[in-house]
Amino acid sequence: NVVAQDAAGNSSPPATVTVDSSAPPAPVINPSNGVVISGTAEAGATVTLTDAGGNPIGQVTADGSGNWSFTPGTPLANGTVIVATATDPTGNTGPQAATTVDAVAPPAPVIDPSNGTTISGTAEAGAKVILTDGNGNPIGETTADGSGNWTFTPATPLANGTVVNAVAQDPAGNTGPQGSTTVDAVAPNTPVVNPSNGNLLNGTAEPGS
């Protein structure tokens, strides 16, 4: 508690302050493609951003929920290291956090042949796979696992001939080119089996079946 006393001996009501000597934790930096840098930190803390050489990128203040976001005047180049520290309102600065800009878009997803019941394929590991039809109408979204495999089951099987387009969006927000396939929900014709003496069975069927 602090009071003020004038020369005549009059004392003011006390003012109270609580000492804060604890540094905030390191900020969390979300994956970034260099266009926007965001994350979380102690609410009200000033987040200072520099590159690996200590050159300033910018400063921003975390809101009451601890969220912060900063947009550089020019997008940061792929591979730029971003270093962030948080300084609380009393001047305590916490440890550093760092991330590396990923500004490279993932490749187009591979879509396996589908009969419309399930759509599956491969994409960059961890990427969000966004599926639309040939007119751009949404079909659904899913995320590729650590091996790059993904699968999506529509609530209603897609009709024969439906065009399925897929793009992959990585955690940094980069969206790659489109992959595409067409639903084949028509069963093949009955195979033709040639006469056989039992030593060899052969015949004809739908190509690729």
Enumerate the language-model features and the residues they cover.
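Ser/Thr-rich low-complexity repeats and stalk/linker segments
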Residues: 1-209
